[in-house]
Each structure stands twice: as C-alpha cells, then as structure tokens.
Amino acid sequence: MLGEEAEPQWISEEVKTGTTIIAIEFNGGVVLGSDSRVSAGDSVVNRVMNKLSPLHDKIYCALSGSAADAQTIAEMVNYQLDVHSLEIDEDPQVRSAATLVKNISYKYKEELSAHLIVAGWDRRDGGQVFATLGGLLTRQPFAIGGSGSSYVYGFVDAEYRRGMTKEECQKFVVNTLALAMNRDGSSGGVAYIVTIDEHSTDEKVILGNDLPTFFDQ
C-alpha cells in the first residue's frame, strides 16, 4: 500500500550456507575448511559465519545447505555424543558421530535440506573423513560439498595425492577454498580452517585479502 515500505525479498527467502566445504585426511589427522558467506536468495545475510561446527573435542562437521537445518543437526549430534561419551567413559569414535548425522539426515530427508561432512580423529582409526549426503555414509580420503564444489572438482582431482603431509593438506584446503570463493557467487568472506590430530585441535581464520590468488584474479 501507498505509504508502507515494501518488505525486502530476502526476509521471505530461506537462509542458506550456500557454500564451499572440504575435509581431507592426512597421516595422523584431518584438515577441514569452509568459506563464511550465508545468503538468502540474492542477498548476503552473514559474511563471517563459521561453518565448521564442533561435535566433540576432536570431531567437527562442515555445514552446507539450509543454515537452520545444518545447525540443528549439528546441535542434536553434539548433545547425543556428549551423552554417549559419558555412558562409555571415553571419547566417541568419528564413525559414531558420522552415523548419527547419517541417521538424522535419512530419517528427516523429506524435511531437511543439509549436507554435513564429518571429520575428526580417534584412537581406533586415526584421522577420518565421512560424507553423509542424503543419509548415505561413506568414508573418503577427502570430501567436498556446497555450491562452490562444482567449480573445483577438476582442481582437487588433479592436485590430490595420497600420503600428503599435514602442511600439504592445509595448503590444499586453502587453495581449494580460494578458487571456489573466486568462482562461486554464493561462496565468499573469510576461510575457516580446523586441523585435528592426536595432540591438538587448531582453529584458524584466513581473511579474504590473505587468501592465495591465481592467474585470473
């Protein structure tokens, strides 16, 4: 009506982490990474969301899809892992966390729109990466997801090799994110990196200006 301000379109759009996420195993641990842009339709509603969510001390998940759905799954699994850890009086296994994510994703697959990559370290199997798309559980040496992943499949296929060191995996993750954030309009902001091994869980933020550049930038 005349005299009333029109409601911005993004208010009625679903908020999505429309996104680039990645996780990779190295001998003794894992490296996870994500961009930080959150969008609703064509609007950016958050430029610095951390999409790497802790599920337990040495288990993280990378979030993509609907921000609300992905965060809800992560919070449910975090709670269940805390209870499970108290029951068994030891840290949970990475596969247990991934199985919980898989079960929730499959049970509510008609209602939820989220893809979580679960990665971490445990004493039984060391560093592990699991993809849980649509309720399917697969362990992989590395996994990528989100809208930005379609722009970097060629890069990761060409650059990945088994047996990379921790430092090489960190560089691989950062370069993959930088390329995806340059190509994908729904990815951007800063890069969040988490490195997990037996001895530590290290979180790092790389500002956009500090990300590597490539020949077309």
UniProtKB/Swiss-Prot annotation:
InterPro entries per the UniProt record, alphabetical: Ntn_hydrolases_N (IPR029055), Pept_T1A_subB (IPR000243), Proteasome_bsu_CS (IPR016050), Proteasome_sua/b (IPR001353), Proteasome_suB-type (IPR023333)
Residues carrying the site annotation Cleavage: G18, T19
GO molecular function, one term: threonine-type endopeptidase activity
Keyword Cytoplasm: yes
Post-translational note: Autocleaved. The resulting N-terminal Thr residue of the mature subunit is responsible for the nucleophile proteolytic activity.
GO cellular component terms listed in the entry, alphabetical order: cytosol; nucleus; proteasome core complex, beta-subunit complex
Subcellular compartments: Cytoplasm; Nucleus
EC number: 3.4.25.1
Active site: residue positions: T19 (nucleophile)
Function per UniProt: The proteasome is a multicatalytic proteinase complex which is characterized by its ability to cleave peptides with Arg, Phe, Tyr, Leu, and Glu adjacent to the leaving group at neutral or slightly basic pH. The proteasome has an ATP-dependent proteolytic activity. This subunit is involved in antigen processing to generate class I binding peptides.
Annotated family: Belongs to the peptidase T1B family.
Full protein name: Proteasome subunit beta type-9
Organism whose genome encodes this protein: Oryzias latipes
